[in-house]
Amino acid sequence: MIQTQTVLDVADNSGARRVMCIKVLGGSHRRYASIGDVIKVSVKEAIPRGKVKKGQVLKAVVVRTRKGVRRQDGSLIRFDGNAAVLLNNQEQPIGTRIFGPVTRELRGEKFMKIISLAPEVL
């Protein structure tokens, strides 16, 4: 459950390290985002010579949450932290590598690129 002001780790090599959610996209008064949802983020911490700079406002897709995701068979997949992958305006990933596992829930038409780059799909 990601909401406004939540700080997330970045799970790609775009150059950002930590981002803060500033808006949950998809609905006029939507409060929470979970795995697979697109959010608007502000870069809070970035490495030098990265593709993105501190203070930049971008879109991101949530790939891991502490809350987890419930499957049809009743199992719950939970992670140690909240993480997102940064997207450009066409909703394609900015980075060329993904770090850490991602879930099968991202397997829609929009995020197949993230699934193919990820080292592990749960």
Swiss-Prot record:
Part of the 50S ribosomal subunit. Forms a cluster with proteins L3 and L19. In the 70S ribosome, L14 and L19 interact and together make contacts with the 16S rRNA in bridges B5 and B8. Binds to 23S rRNA. Forms part of two intersubunit bridges in the 70S ribosome. This is Large ribosomal subunit protein uL14. Gene3D superfamilies: Ribosomal protein L14. It holds the Pfam family Ribosomal_L14. Signal peptide: none annotated. CDD domains: Ribosomal_uL14 (cd00337). Keywords: Ribonucleoprotein, Ribosomal protein, RNA-binding, rRNA-binding. PROSITE patterns: RIBOSOMAL_L14 (PS00049). SUPFAM superfamilies: Ribosomal protein L14. GO terms for cellular component: cytosolic large ribosomal subunit. GO terms for molecular function: large ribosomal subunit rRNA binding; structural constituent of ribosome. GO terms for biological process: translation. The lineage of its organism: Bacteria, Pseudomonadati, Pseudomonadota, Gammaproteobacteria, Oceanospirillales. NCBIfam families: rplN_bact. It comes from the Bacteria. Belongs to the universal ribosomal protein uL14 family.
